[in-house]
C-alpha cells in the first residue's frame, strides 16, 4: 500500500478514486502520569509520556485507515493527512485520512 501526502504517485496515474478513508483513535494517559505531566509543564521541556501516547495513537489511526483502504481494494492513499483534537484534559483524538485510489503504472 502506497501512502502519500501528494495527489499523485510518480510512475503511476490514478485509474479510479474509491473514496475517502479514515482511521481514528482516542487515547488518554494514566491519571498518575497526567499529574506528573502537569508538574513537567511548570519546569518546561518535553513531556515524554504524551509524546509516546501521540506517537502510538498516530500509528493506530494510520493502521486503521490502511485497513479501510484495503477493504476497498485500494492500491494507494493519496492526499494523506493527520488531524488531532483535544477531547478532554489528558485525552486526544488522532484522525488519519486520505483518498483511496486504484493506480495504473505508466
Swiss-Prot record:
Top-level taxon of origin: Bacteria
Protein name, as recorded: UPF0145 protein Tpet_0165
PANTHER family: UPF0145 PROTEIN SCO3412 (PTHR34068:SF2), UPF0145 PROTEIN YBJQ (PTHR34068)
A Pfam family assignment: YbjQ_1
Family (UniProt): Belongs to the UPF0145 family.
HAMAP family noted in UniProt: UPF0145
Alphabetized InterPro entries for the sequence: UPF0145_dom_sf (IPR035439), UPF0145_YbjQ-like (IPR002765)
Amino acid at each position: 500500500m502506497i501512502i502519500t501526502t501528494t495527489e499523485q504517485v510518480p510512475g503511476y496515474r490514478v485509474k479510479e478514486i474509491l473514496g475517502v478513508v479514515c482511521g481514528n483513535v482516542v487515547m488518554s494517559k494514566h491519571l498518575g502520569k497526567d499529574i506528573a505531566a502537569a508538574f513537567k509543564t511548570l519546569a518546561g521541556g518535553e513531556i515524554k509520556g504524551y509524546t509516546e501516547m501521540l506517537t502510538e495513537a498516530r500509528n493506530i489511526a494510520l493502521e486503521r485507515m490502511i485497513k479501510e483502504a484495503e477493504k476497498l481494494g485500494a492500491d494507494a492513499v493519496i492526499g494523506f493527512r493527520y488531524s488531532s483534537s483535544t477531547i478532554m484534559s489528558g485525552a486526544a483524538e488522532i484522525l488519519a485520512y486520505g483518498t483511496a485510489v486504484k493506480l495504473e503504472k505508466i
